[in-house]
Amino acid sequence: MSFETWMAALDGYMTETFGLGYQDIADWTYRDAYDDGLTFREAAHRAINHEFL
């Protein structure tokens, strides 16, 4: 899966699950997460936790 496709899946998952897309929260290291092999779901949860916890 390309990074662009991964980000689109992450954004859709975040919007459906949390009611916020990735552009609605502070910048996070999405590219690093992708390069490290995280799924878009794992990355979404980590980004949300980073923003709110």
UniProtKB/Swiss-Prot annotation:
InterPro entries: DUF5419 (IPR039451)
Pfam family, one: DUF5419
Name of the protein: Gene 87 protein
Native species: Mycobacterium phage L5
Gene behind this protein: 87
